[in-house]
């Protein structure tokens, strides 16, 4: 992928009709990024990165993950405030997932921190499948839910887009779509939990051999971000 630091690349992208980029920023914690070998993402450069996109009329959708070993309970408010302060247009917010076959899964398995072997739950949205290091699974889930609803709250939408001012005619409806979509997501999750109570054995993985994992899923970590945004 061409570097997002290349202004000529961004100029050509905008001229082609590109409206938005997805970039795996992953976290506002440099310690969390360094701990997962993603130190090429520099938190101190996020504002400049956004300004470069916005100068070309391109919005930025960031991938944000919660649940890294260096994340504590402050990470949720820090993320919402930090992304609001720099005018991030949108975010796809998820839970860190240690997919079988990755070093993340092997590490957590060796530390006896995998608590859920039901494959349906490895979706980054509905369940915490391991024990986080600096909070409980319930605290991680609650913080994740809070951060999503806060990021897409009317106050935060106004704050972020007042800074961005990029494609407001489509960026405002896009944010509102996410805001209203959270209600549907919560209903779907509640329905999923009800089904699981009725059919507890469906889809359960009895045991996953961490030394073999699952072929075709050999990433460096459970989730993959963009390379080189300095």
Predicted regions span which residues?
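Small-residue-biased low-complexity repeat regions
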Residues: 213-228
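A structural motif corresponding to the C-terminal lobe/cap of the Radical SAM core domain
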Residues: 1-169, 193-209, 230
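Short, amphipathic C-terminal "tail helix"
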Residues: 171-200
């Amino acid at each position: 992928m061409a570097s997002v630091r290349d202004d000529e690349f961004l100029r050509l992208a905008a001229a082609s009709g590109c409206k938005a980029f997805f970039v795996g920023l992953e976290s506002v914690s440099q310690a969390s990024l360094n701990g997962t070998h993603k130190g090429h993402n520099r938190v101190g450069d996020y504002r400049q990165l956004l300004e470069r996109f916005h100068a070309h009329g391109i919005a930025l959708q960031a991938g944000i993950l919660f649940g890294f070993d260096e994340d504590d309970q402050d990470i949720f408010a820090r993320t919402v405030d930090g992304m609001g302060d720099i005018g991030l247009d949108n975010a796809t917010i998820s839970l860190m997932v240690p997919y079988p076959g990755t070093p993340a899964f092997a590490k957590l398995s060796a530390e006896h921190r995998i608590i859920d072997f039901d494959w349906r739950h490895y979706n980054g949205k509905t369940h915490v499948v391991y024990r986080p290091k600096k909070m409980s699974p319930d605290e991680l889930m609650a913080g994740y839910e809070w951060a999503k609803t806060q990021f897409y709250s009317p106050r935060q939408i106004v704050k972020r887009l007042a800074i961005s001012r990029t494609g407001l005619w489509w960026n405002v409806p896009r944010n509102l779509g996410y805001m209203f979509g959270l209600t549907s997501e919560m209903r779907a999750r509640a329905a999923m939990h009800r089904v699981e109570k009725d059919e507890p054995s469906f889809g359960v993985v009895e045991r996953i051999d961490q030394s073999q994992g699952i072929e075709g899923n050999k990433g460096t970590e459970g989730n993959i971000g963009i390379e080189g945004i300095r």
